Amino acid sequence: MARIAGVDLPREKRVEIALTYIYGIGLSTSQKILSTTGISPDARVKDLSEDEVNEIRTYINKNLMVEGDLRRDVALNIKRLVEIGSYRGIRHRRGLPVRGQKTKTNARTRKGPKKTMANKKK
C-alpha cells in the first residue's frame, strides 16, 4: 500500500482518485500532480512502482501544504481572526456562518439542532 504524506492510499482505486484521500488535495490538484510527474491517471495504486510513488511524494513535499501542516495553518488563521476581534472572528466564536449566509431559517449545520421555545400565551 502506497503511503504518501502520512496517508495510506487505497490500492484498488485509480491514482487520480486515491490522491484525493490526502487532506488538501482535490481532483484538480491530483490531475496537476500526475501531469507534472508524467504518471497515467488511469493507473491503479497497486500498479505503481516505488519510483513513481517517490516521485509523487517528492512533488507533494516540495510544492504543496497538506495534512497536518495545512490543518494547523487553517486553525491558526481562525485563531488569529478570533483574537483580533474581526467580524469573521466573532462569527467563528459564536458558531454562526462566517460568509454572509442568512441565519433566520437556515444554518442548522453551524448552529446545531433547533432549540424550541415555549409558546407565549395570548
From Swiss-Prot:
SUPFAM superfamilies: S13-like H2TH domain
Keywords: Ribonucleoprotein, Ribosomal protein, RNA-binding, rRNA-binding, tRNA-binding
Any Gene Ontology CC annotation: small ribosomal subunit
Cited InterPro entries: Rbsml_uS13_C, Ribosomal_uS13, Ribosomal_uS13-like_H2TH, Ribosomal_uS13_bac-type, Ribosomal_uS13_CS
A Pfam family recorded for this sequence: Ribosomal_S13
GO biological process, one term: translation
A molecular function GO annotation: structural constituent of ribosome
Keyword rRNA-binding recorded: yes
Region Disordered: start-end pairs: 93-122
The family this protein is said to belong to: Belongs to the universal ribosomal protein uS13 family.
General function of this protein: Located at the top of the head of the 30S subunit, it contacts several helices of the 16S rRNA. In the 70S ribosome it contacts the 23S rRNA (bridge B1a) and protein L5 of the 50S subunit (bridge B1b), connecting the 2 subunits; these bridges are implicated in subunit movement. Contacts the tRNAs in the A and P-sites.
Subunit structure and binding partners: Part of the 30S ribosomal subunit. Forms a loose heterodimer with protein S19. Forms two bridges to the 50S subunit in the 70S ribosome.
PANTHER family: 30S RIBOSOMAL PROTEIN S13/40S RIBOSOMAL PROTEIN S18, SMALL RIBOSOMAL SUBUNIT PROTEIN US13M
Name used for this protein in its record: Small ribosomal subunit protein uS13
Organism encoding this protein: Clostridium botulinum (strain Eklund 17B / Type B)
